Amino acid sequence: MPRTARILPEEGIFHVLTRGNNRKEVFHEASDFETYLHILVRIQRRHSFKLYHYCLMTNHVHLLLETTLGHSLSQIMKKLNLTYALYYKKKYGHVGHFWQDRFKSFLVEKDIYLLACAAYIELNPVKAGMTEDPAQYPYSSFSFYASQRPSALLSLNPLWETFGDTEEIRRRNYREFVLGRLEDYEAFEKNYFSKLALGSREFLESLEARFNIFISRRRRGRPRKETVTSDEK
């Protein structure tokens, strides 16, 4: 079966990755990060998607979001990327291509894979050497979960309640889960980006049948699940 560069059903959970052209910085100061998030809020109000996790790095952006019928990912990302690029070009006098391609997207199954993807996103600043604790990085969703930092932008991960019976337990277990994924970070990244989607064998095979594509099965395996617990510690 032919392989496509993108799977874009109108409804689904997507990990979206957008990079600056030639991996150049797209955020230079706090106001740039904040402007991007403000733009995202405005677009969310118009397109009714749920944002579960995000991380804004200096030269790229990770979003983990769920789209709804009538509001495609392509519409959302086209508006978001264009609006921020216009802001940046006006502020810094930039000329030429701003983003590298349009964006990359990966469908994610609503299962442990969704949590593994969330941890990967929120560990980006740690792996980049920008901080030792993801809670210290201000431009990600980690503190929304680990510390209950308020957010007008974020919706709770659909699997949030699997982390415990109370908010305090869930926050503690979530933090332990994310930090526990550090040891698997490189292996997850290498395996993950060789595919078009992240999920179980059944999930990937259903996508192959639905979209008439081939999804790589190299190194497939479930993320470790034992660290997601509802037990008090």
PLM regions: where:
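Short Pro-Cys-Gly-centered "Cys-loop" motif that presents a nucleophilic cysteine in a tight turn
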Residues: 1-53, 57, 66-233
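Short acidic-rich active-site patches of cyclic nucleotide enzymes
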Residues: 60
